[in-house]
């Protein structure tokens, strides 16, 4: 009986996904120790409110254990745009990253969003994904905080920038999603395609966390194989299974981030191309964005 005949492919439950994330990061941190002693990413939210307490601008980011920040969302109410509010909230989040000791910030933006804006703030493009989704380009940009960098100086705006709550993070995300929907054609809800391989004793020996977004882009979020079972093709089997299912659901492209120099060769062997490389994150290593057209 072959190895594959001894294993069963099953759908993953939520508890499986949480365990998968923990196992992936345990492995990562065994290779590259944490810089910040935090168990989960630290959420940073800055907002600007009007006299009635309504949020009119906001920016959110996440600080990671390897001394980096990912800026997730930035939004300004349409009535208040081009008045410096976005820059004020954005720079307030950047300031937190600097004060916490982060050495790099990175972020993503589509072609209809704010690439020129980020370039003016001293960011550099390191990854470009074409037709992602179809008809659009996706950019990833970065700024080093441990080296000299350029950017706009803060300007007076007539409003105070204050800390936001978790509820404010959700609100800012919802508002940005509403803006994005004016430019993107959602085809369906997000489709989870999380799978696991289980041995005869019921032990999970490999798993993938993946899915197809509303705009028909497939994402591989996490992939893990138990050390005892590595080198036997289980990771490739899960990736191929996901690719097949994603294509059946309408995906035209598969992308993945959080690919590092210790696992990039696996993706290259499975015919993924490198869209971009963020050097020296984590320190002394590289993070990659990869893709495959279906």
Regions found by a protein language model. Give the residues of each.
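Conserved beta-strand in the GNAT
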Residues: 54-62, 68-75, 203-211, 217-224
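A generic structural motif
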Residues: 62, 132, 211-212, 281
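Conserved GNAT acetyl-CoA-binding A-motif
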Residues: 97-111, 246-259
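Conserved acetyl-CoA-binding loop-helix of GNAT-fold acetyltransferases
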Residues: 82-95, 120, 231-244, 269
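Active-site rim helix/loop that mediates acceptor-substrate recognition in acyltransferases
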Residues: 21-52, 60, 170-204, 209
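Conserved catalytic-core motifs of GNAT/GCN5-like acyltransferases
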Residues: 106-108, 119, 124-142, 255-257, ...
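Conserved N-terminal entry element of GNAT/NAT acetyltransferase domains
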Residues: 1-15, 143-165
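A short, internal acetyl-CoA/4′-phosphopantetheine-binding micro-motif in the GNAT/acyltransferase core
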Residues: 74-82, 223-231
């Amino acid at each position: 009986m072959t190895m594959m005949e001894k294993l069963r492919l099953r759908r993953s439950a939520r508890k499986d996904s949480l365990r998968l994330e923990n196992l992936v990061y345990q492995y990562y941190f065994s290779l590259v120790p944490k810089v910040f002693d935090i168990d989960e990413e630290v959420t940073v939210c800055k907002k600007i409110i009007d006299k009635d307490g309504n949020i009119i601008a906001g920016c959110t980011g996440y600080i990671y254990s390897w001394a980096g920040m990912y800026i997730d969302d930035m939004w300004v109410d349409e009535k208040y745009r081009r008045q410096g509010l976005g820059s004020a909230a954005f720079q307030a989040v950047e300031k937190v990253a600097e004060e916490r000791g982060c050495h790099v910030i990175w972020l993503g933006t589509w072609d209809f969003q704010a690439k020129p804006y980020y370039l003016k703030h001293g960011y550099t493009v390191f990854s470009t994904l074409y037709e992602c989704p179809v008809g659009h380009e996706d950019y990833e940009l970065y700024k080093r905080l441990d080296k000299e960098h350029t950017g706009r100086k803060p300007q007076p705006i007539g409003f105070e920038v204050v800390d936001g709550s978790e509820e404010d993070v959700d609100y800012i995300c919802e508002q940005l999603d509403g803006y994005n929907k004016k430019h993107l054609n959602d085809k369906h809800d997000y489709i989870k395609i999380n799978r696991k391989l289980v041995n005869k004793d019921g032990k999970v020996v490999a798993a993938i966390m993946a899915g197809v977004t509303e705009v028909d882009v497939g994402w591989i979020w996490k992939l893990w194989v138990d050390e005892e079972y590595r080198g036997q093709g289980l990771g490739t089997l899960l990736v191929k299974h996901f690719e097949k299912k994603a294509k059946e659901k309408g995906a035209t492209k598969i992308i993945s981030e959080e690919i590092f120099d210790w696992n990039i060769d696996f993706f290259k062997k499975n015919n993924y191309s490198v869209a971009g490389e963020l050097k020296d994150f984590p320190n002394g290593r590289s993070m990659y964005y990869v893709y495959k057209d279906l």
